[in-house]
Curated annotation (Swiss-Prot):
GO terms for cellular component: plasma membrane; proton-transporting ATP synthase complex; proton-transporting two-sector ATPase complex, proton-transporting domain. The chain crosses the membrane at residues 8-28, 55-75. This is ATP synthase subunit c. F-type ATPases have 2 components, F(1) - the catalytic core - and F(0) - the membrane proton channel. F(1) has five subunits: alpha(3), beta(3), gamma(1), delta(1), epsilon(1). F(0) has three main subunits: a(1), b(2) and c(10-14). The alpha and beta chains form an alternating ring which encloses part of the gamma chain. F(1) is attached to F(0) by a central stalk formed by the gamma and epsilon chains, while a peripheral stalk is formed by the delta and b chains. It holds the Pfam family ATP-synt_C. It is a multi-pass membrane protein. It is found in: Cell membrane. InterPro entries: ATP_synth_csu_bac/chlpt, ATP_synth_F0_csu, ATP_synth_F0_csu_DDCD_BS, ATP_synth_F0_csu_sf, ATPase_proteolipid_c-like_dom, F/V-ATP_Csub_sf. Keywords: ATP synthesis, Cell membrane, CF(0), Hydrogen ion transport, Ion transport, Lipid-binding, Membrane, Transmembrane, Transmembrane helix, Transport. The gene is atpE. The keyword Transcription does not apply. F(1)F(0) ATP synthase produces ATP from ADP in the presence of a proton or sodium gradient. F-type ATPases consist of two structural domains, F(1) containing the extramembraneous catalytic core and F(0) containing the membrane proton channel, linked together by a central stalk and a peripheral stalk. During catalysis, ATP synthesis in the catalytic domain of F(1) is coupled via a rotary mechanism of the central stalk subunits to proton translocation. Key component of the F(0) channel; it plays a direct role in translocation across the membrane. A homomeric c-ring of between 10-14 subunits forms the central stalk rotor element with the F(1) delta and epsilon subunits. PROSITE patterns: ATPASE_C (PS00605). It comes from Dehalococcoides mccartyi (strain ATCC BAA-2100 / JCM 16839 / KCTC 5957 / BAV1). Its main location: membrane.
Amino acid sequence: MEADVIKLLAAGLAMGLGAIGPGIGVGILGFGALQAIGRNPEAKGSIFTNMILLVAFAESIAIFALVISIVLIFVA
């Protein structure tokens, strides 16, 4: 295989595998937040605020994977 093909394959794997974890995590987080709101509707504001903050933290992992894949394509 040529070096360019290997670089593109590595970048694709880095982004694909780096996005699986945050995707699953955000799904579980949303499920838990909706269950909590269903049990205690008065706490909706607090639960929603915490959920948005944690979703941002989870998605930062996917952004790091994107940066790594871009570095693999253009720098390595």
